[in-house]
Amino acid sequence: MAQSVPPGDIQTQPGTKIVFNAPYDDKHTYHIKVINSSARRIGYGIKTTNMKRLGVDPPCGVLDPKEAVFLAVSCDAFAFGQEDTNNDRITVEWTNTPDGAAKQFRREWFQGDGMVRRKNLPIEYNP
């Protein structure tokens, strides 16, 4: 059963943070790469701390072993310096898919008692 084995590692490019540069009066999009470096198929989901400012497309999916996906992280226009951006980040959550499951994302993979791993990518805003 896949859930008894902890999910393996993923890699992200960039590896530690996402940087957006001013001006912030227009929407910015930054692409990141998520790589399943484990030997098992995983399901992933992306969360953001500020859903009205930050978006991710696609927000979830399934990756086979060694497979990668590009995600578009977008930052909508906002009043820089007038809004709190200190805790902005995106979080990649992933878990092993059940053995024999179709390659189609299912939210319930994250709601059972299986192990879910997380990687936080803080957002940095350059003035």
From Swiss-Prot:
Cellular component per GO, a single term: pseudopodium
Q: Where in the cell is it found?
A: Cell projection, Pseudopodium; Cytoplasm, Cytoskeleton
User: Where mainly located?
Assistant: other
InterPro entries, A to Z: Ig-like_fold, MSP_dom, Nematode_MSP, PapD-like_sf
Pinpoint the MSP domain residues.
9-126
Pfam family example for this protein?
Motile_Sperm
The task this protein performs is described as:
Central component in molecular interactions underlying sperm crawling. Forms an extensive filament system that extends from sperm villipoda, along the leading edge of the pseudopod.
This chain's protein is named Major sperm protein 33
- UniProt lists the gene as msp-33
